[in-house]
A protein has these predicted regions:
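Early extracytoplasmic/domain-onset interaction patches
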Residues: 17-59
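Sec-dependent N-terminal signal peptides
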Residues: 3-13
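Short amphipathic beta-strand and strand-loop transition segments with alternating hydrophobic
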Residues: 26-33, 84-99, 110-115, 171
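Hydrophobic residues positioned within well-ordered beta-strands of beta-sheet architectures
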Residues: 25-27, 39-43, 107, 123-125, ...
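Extracellular adhesion/glycan-binding regions together with long Ser/Thr-
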Residues: 92-114, 175-191
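Surface-exposed, acidic/Ser/Thr-rich flexible loop segments
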Residues: 48, 52, 99-170
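Intrinsically disordered, low-complexity linkers and stems that provide flexible hinges
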Residues: 28-30, 87, 137-204
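Solvent-exposed beta-hairpin/edge-strand motifs
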Residues: 53-93, 145-169
Length: 204
């Protein structure tokens, strides 16, 4: 009986760890009005490195992150103190095996306490990016281009817009608010280069 309980406990831990890891596989984008060149991003990840006292969301070159970025500790529900740091400052922490560009930008969230041995912390990053080169409207048509690196990627068009073309296979549906949502699955080891185009829906 004791062995059975131990086995069940180990199975539960394994399933929980797998579930947490699975959630690292997806990212969600919500396109705002193309005249703003802005879109929102949300993604989760788990931090396991013993002694790590902060987490980072790295901003791609060419994008500008809004100051209202939030990082939430999903295990406690609390918002972390966030601030913008340079790649040089991140590299000095020694948390990541591959150094980032010293001139790059990241949003840093400070954990309430460093990661303890055999513990982990799950966080959610929510940000608004501005990318005039990658998201714009021309002649009444919006264009959004981006490389997607996660296995599962969701992109939602602004309210009132319909999809006219997409260069990569996607599952297309409507969300609860009637907005067009695209689901991209990437089973390769490299990134998907996505180009989405859309137009405003004509009113009857």
């Amino acid at each position: 009986m004791k062995r059975a309980l131990i086995a069940l406990a180990l199975l539960a831990i394994a399933q929980q760890s797998f579930h947490r890891a699975e959630q690292d596989r997806e990212i969600r984008y919500w396109l705002l009005d193309p005249s703003t060149h802005q879109f929102r991003i949300s993604h989760d990840f788990t931090v396991t490195r013993v002694g790590q006292a902060s987490v980072h969301s790295f901003v791609r070159k060419g994008s500008v992150v809004a100051p209202d970025a939030t990082i939430i500790d999903l295990d406690t529900g609390k918002k972390l103190h966030t601030h913008v740091v340079t790649g040089k400052e991140v590299n000095a922490l020694g948390y990541y095996p591959t150094p980032v560009d010293a001139d790059s930008i990241a949003v840093q969230g400070d954990l309430e306490e460093p990661i303890a041995k055999d513990h982990s912390t799950r966080v959610r990053v929510e940000e608004t990016y501005t990318d005039a080169a990658g998201y714009f409207e021309k002649d009444g048509e919006l264009t959004w281009t981006r490389t997607l690196g996660r296995p599962l990627n969701y992109v939602t068009l602004p309210a009132g817009w319909m999809l006219t073309s997409v260069n990569t296979p996607a599952t297309i549906s409507l969300d609860d608010e009637g907005r067009v949502k695209l689901r991209f699955v990437n089973i390769r080891n490299d990134e998907l280069s996505i180009t989405i185009k859309g137009r405003r829906r004509t009113r009857p």
